[in-house]
Amino acid sequence: MRRSTDKILTTHTGNLPWVDAPDGSEADFEPRLKAAVSDIVKWQRDTGIDIINEGEFTKGGDWLSFMDGRIGGCEVRTDTDNRAAVFKGREQQVFADFYKYAAEAGTLFYLADGQIKVQRNYWVCTSAISYTGQDALAKEMALMKDAAGTDDVFLTSTAPASLEPYYENEFYESEEAFLFAIADALKAEYEAIVEAGFLLQVDDAWLPALWDRIGIDMGLEAFQKRSMLRVEALNHALSGIRQDKIRYPLCWGSWHGPHVF
């Protein structure tokens, strides 16, 4: 990662607006995606941003759902215990009227044209977890490399703690074994990004954001213990990768609602 004593280097955390983004089904999607990546790279450089990415356009503009299909051994389920944990938090209880109104109005999560984002899939792991995203990742890296090279360029991935809320375990003998299996799968993606010459950004929004969902009820000490196990899993996934190749942003939750807890 480049450092400077002459200027404050600038960057951002990944997601940039693609106002006329197609949904992926159009016949001209691939050339439009390539052109959009090229344009957003040029915009960042013309703006003076030093460390850039592809705006997460190759990921559909979403920091997490791009992982769908990259984790083997799991199947989609419509109703899981984890789904309840993610969407039922203290703020939803205290501000119940607001969340009811916002959910009906579609203002919590929306796209540039006002459409609500597609709900995330929820998965149940029924066999050994593996990484199956090699082709999708290779395509992302090729588009980014073609548009910008690899110097001062980052690509994003997801931390084990932030993938876990959307996955439920029906295979591993313990929570720890399940979590470290996720970490092993993600390790393959992390290493591929760095080996290709990019900086790796590991997004971990849910590590702190679950405080409102489950942490308050379990208490601070128990939540800290829970979080530490997930930090250890992330460190396991990152083992062997130089620290100066890694970016690690946390998030308090980016939905358009009250944030008081």
Question: Where on the chain are the PLM-derived regions?
Answer:
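Domain-level signal for soluble alpha/beta catalytic cores
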Residues: 1-261
